[in-house]
Each structure stands twice: as structure tokens, then as C-alpha cells.
């Protein structure tokens, strides 16, 4: 059995089915990407599964991908996400995009922004030490 066939077998063992979209991409891409997808989407990594799905959902919302949004919503729910958490993720996804749009529209000086972020970080560190 070749690498592609072994990959399909592993996908079926992991997901219960080999989704059609996985069969539709080039074989070499699937054999390279599947181990990474399996590890970082479904396996153990530094970021807990529910939080990985929140990240994926926030990105999905910003790139306006219904496929990704559906998958990340389902997987977040499977990993214990509550309705309140999902609502917060939706807000944070829109909030980040909105502020990014405002900074770009203002053509705010990036070097100034960097300095201000560092100032805020230093202030937050000091405030945290006091508490």
C-alpha cells in the first residue's frame, strides 16, 4: 500500500469517513497536510482543543468561509464550548477586524502604534504586579 492509500486509511480511521473534499485535492497535498491537520486540529498540541477551535472560528468569520465556520463551530461544541463562549468568540472576531479596519483607514503610523503597544504592555505588567 502506498503513502496516499495509507493516508486515506488513517483519515477513515480518525474521522470515520474520508470526506470528498479530501479526495478532491492533489494526492501529494493530502499526504503532506493530513498529518499536520490530524495533529493540530484533532490531536494534542500546546493549545487546548476548544481554544484551537475558537481561533479557527474567529479566522473563519474574518475570511467569511462557511465551510470553516461550520467545522470549527461543530468541533468547538464537541469540545465543550458553551453558547456564551461562542458569542464571545463572535464578538472578538468582529472587534479585531473592526479595529484593524479603523487603523488602516486612519493610516495610523505603525511605528507610533508599536511604541504605544509597548507602553501599554509595560503599564499592564506593573499593574499586574501590584495586584
Could you describe each region identified by the protein language model?
Residues 30-31, 71-86:
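Iron-sulfur (Fe-S) cluster-binding segments and ferredoxin-like electron-carrier domains
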Residues 1-51, 105-131:
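Acidic, glycine/proline-rich low-complexity segments that act as flexible tails and inter-domain linkers
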Residues 91-109:
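Short Fe-S-cluster ligation motifs
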Residues 71-78, 104-112:
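Juxtamembrane/interface motifs at transmembrane-helix termini
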Amino acid at each position: 500500500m502506498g503513502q496516499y492509500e495509507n493516508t486515506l486509511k488513517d483519515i477513515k480511521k480518525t474521522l470515520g469517513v474520508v470526506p470528498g473534499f479530501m479526495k478532491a485535492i492533489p494526492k501529494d497535498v493530502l499526504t503532506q497536510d493530513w498529518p499536520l491537520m490530524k495533529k493540530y486540529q484533532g490531536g494534542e498540541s500546546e493549545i487546548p482543543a476548544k481554544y484551537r477551535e475558537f481561533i479557527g472560528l474567529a479566522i473563519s468569520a474574518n475570511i467569511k468561509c462557511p465551510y470553516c465556520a461550520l467545522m470549527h463551530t461543530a468541533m468547538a461544541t464537541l469540545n465543550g464550548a458553551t453558547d456564551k463562549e461562542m458569542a464571545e468568540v463572535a464578538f472578538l472576531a468582529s472587534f479585531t477586524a473592526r479595529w484593524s479596519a479603523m487603523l488602516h483607514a486612519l493610516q495610523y503610523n505603525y511605528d507610533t502604534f508599536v511604541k504605544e503597544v509597548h507602553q501599554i504592555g509595560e503599564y499592564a505588567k506593573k499593574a499586574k504586579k501590584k495586584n
